[in-house]
Amino acid sequence: MDDRAYDVLAMGRCGIDLYSNDVGVPFEQIRSFAAYVGGCPTNVSVGTRRLGLRSALLTGVGDDPVGDFVLHFLRQEGVETSFVPRKPGRRTGAVALGIEPPDRFPLVFYRENAADLALDLDDVLRAPVERSRVLFLTGTGLCADPSRTATLFAAERAAAAGT
């Protein structure tokens, strides 16, 4: 029996996804959006928790209302948020998506000064990498430092621990 604290530790992007409520219209004609929490690792942490796994998330949020929105949602879903630091001076990311079936889904990312890209080595040292059965990583964290170094360090720790 594996006695690790978490089944899945997901690391990387989180934010607010704004999906068009007006399906089939050009982006410039959208009248309203619905707000959801998003980011691949964030979605994985929620999905695995809904499947009954012990799920934790390692990401960063800004000290802003969007960060509050993300944390509130994750806590309601039962995802462990102890490893989601607030990053002062940074913003929680956002994306706006249009829906133009069958094959157009225009999107605009707002990632300037994104909090999740401020994850650093100290954040990884505080995270339960060795106490997780799986470390789930995505490529977004590799796009810039300090998150690039932190992501590679997390991968090294996981490999050394047999995660």
What is each of the regions a protein language model found here?
Residues 1-10, 73, 101-163:
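Ribokinase/PfkB-type carbohydrate-kinase core domain
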Residues 1-80, 103, 119-121:
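Glycine-rich phosphate/adenosyl-contacting loop at the front of the ribokinase-like
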Residues 83-92:
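A short, structured active-site edge motif that brings together acidic residues
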Residues 46, 94-98:
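Short beta-strand scaffold segments in enzyme catalytic cores
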Residues 85-86, 97-105:
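Active-site phosphate-binding/coordination module
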Residues 67-68, 92-94:
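Short Asp/Glu-rich motifs
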